[in-house]
Amino acid sequence: MNVCDLIASMEQAEISPRPVIGVIIVVSGVAVSFLLWLLYVHHASADFAGRWMFLPALNALLNGLCALALCVGLYFIEHHNREAHRASLLLAFAFSSVFLISYIVKHALDGDTIFPGHGPVRTLYLSILASHVILSIVALPMVLTTFFFSLTGRFAMHRRIARLTFPIWLYVSITGVVVFVFLRAYAY
């Protein structure tokens, strides 16, 4: 069964949204809890320090590609091209998924990168980082719920929630790149 067949079967299935959204919230909560544990409790091994220096750049690239795919998807839906819209958003989801895996690997093996700047630039960086983190926590269940409504053919609900999901997901993707740029600009 390919992706198109899976999507078609989901559109035809009568799946009640309430339990699925409950599962989405639980899965999102578990994912966020794991990431918080990874960032604040887990200590990276010194054996791997420095070996994963390419991952932040890869993560920024994936965030940038996600933002681009989101914008292309918006263009397509505004021009009533549902198939291209769907392909663009599935691509954005794939970029975000690969980003999440790469982010977990980087933090599990190499730990955090501390911002070395001081003064107003540090305040600006921390403000952007805080908004990025908070909205990424909000974005996860929203993205999954938006996809659920689309994949099950509930397009009215999909459109309603997508109006909120899109700007949050786009902001998280763009600020992911901005955080990387700040860290690189002040690393030297």
List where the protein language model places each region:
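Alpha-helical membrane insertion/targeting regions
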Residues: 2-188
